[in-house]
Amino acid sequence: MIHIPTEKLADFEKNIRREWTMTNGIGGYAGGSIIGACNRTHQGYLIASLHPPVERYLVFSKTNEKLTQGTHVYNLETSQHAGKGHSPIRTQGQRFLTDFSCDGTVCFSYSAGNIRMDKHLALLRESNTVAISYTITNQGEEAGLSITPLMNFREHSASSAVSDLQFTCEPNTVGGFTLIPAAAPGLCIELSCSAGRLFPRENQYDVDMQYQTEVDNETAGLDTHFCPYDLRFTLPAHSSTEISLLCTVHPVQDTPVLSRPQADTAAIEIAHVQEYYDSLKQQAGYGDDAFANTLVVAADQFLARRDSTGLMTILAGLPWFTDWGRDTMIAFSGLTLATRRFSDAREILLTFAQYVHHGMVPNMFPDDGQDPLYNTADASLWYFYAVDAYLKVTGQPSDYDYIQRRIYPVLREIIHAY
């Protein structure tokens, strides 16, 4: 587990460049900085893969929280916006951040006045859904919590302006609201919440959010998000409160896909994801080696299931690229063999075997779901290397039999073509 305590979190300038990423196993992903601000175009709470593992769209950017207690207002939002001249405007909610942890899921812990709040996020496995669990302990008088979801709909490497973010937007029956993008009327972005009340916002657009890494790369780095509602909650005096917030994207239909969550629904879903990562650590066999187990979890972020084959593949260039053949074969041993994911390794070899054309392994599956591109001469040679590495590590008769039946004919085809 990566764990960063409060004394290392206060510096906005340094920590906005320290980042986390988590994925959902079908090409979707989430990411941000460890202080809660977005730092790149390719970040947000839910970048959904509409045709796994490609066609990736940002649909849910982040949430901003604000606590009120008596005359005190605690703005937990951490963000950077473009200012006049060269000086950005920074909202520094990280001053209330006491802990950040990441182990396949991420958790931000805050302390403000008499209130302690944990905000825990996870992507559900093989689903374009994010779960957020809030656990709040109020040790003082009655308080209030406001959560502002920032929504979007754009290709994950693009940016949005107000004119791009036009939606049909309505409250739904599951405690949140539903968005249908004008740019994709067949899709529905659905947000649900276990409690709270919806309040329409006067200012429905968060404009000129600035991504520092994009600025460092000499682009404007500006983006706009749609925030139609605040969710508001009462935190009784001397109480503990649990809140579940979920967001998903799916084809338009008459009824919500999500049911209204219970207070602990998100926490239960997050626990399932944590159990998944625990099982990967156990399978890898590194025992109590914390560093090795961190690498096992990190390796999983690059593996995804491809719809066109129903098999596993590797997104070695995440988030920028999809399953490029050359990069996949180079990363193959570290991501699957060193982690003892032998079944996934076989599927990855078979995925690329199915796309060999005139002896060439595809070098690129385009992000828009078009036919693969064959534009590298050495990906096929790296494929031989990956097959050899697989047999050296596994070495069982059944493994040799699998390669002989499913892969060897393709190897012969490659040799003949070369």
Predicted feature residues:
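Aromatic-rich carbohydrate-recognition surfaces in CAZymes
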Residues: 138, 160-162, 322, 326-328, ...
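Terminal accessory carbohydrate-recognition/targeting modules of carbohydrate-active enzymes
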Residues: 1-284, 319, 326, 337, ...
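Extended, well-ordered alpha-helical scaffold segments
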Residues: 146, 257-280, 291-298, 340-354, ...
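Short glycine-rich loop/turn motifs
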Residues: 105, 297-300, 315-319, 349
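Internal amphipathic alpha-helical repeat/solenoid segments
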Residues: 309-328
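Active-site-adjacent bridging/hinge elements
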Residues: 210-218, 298-312, 352-362
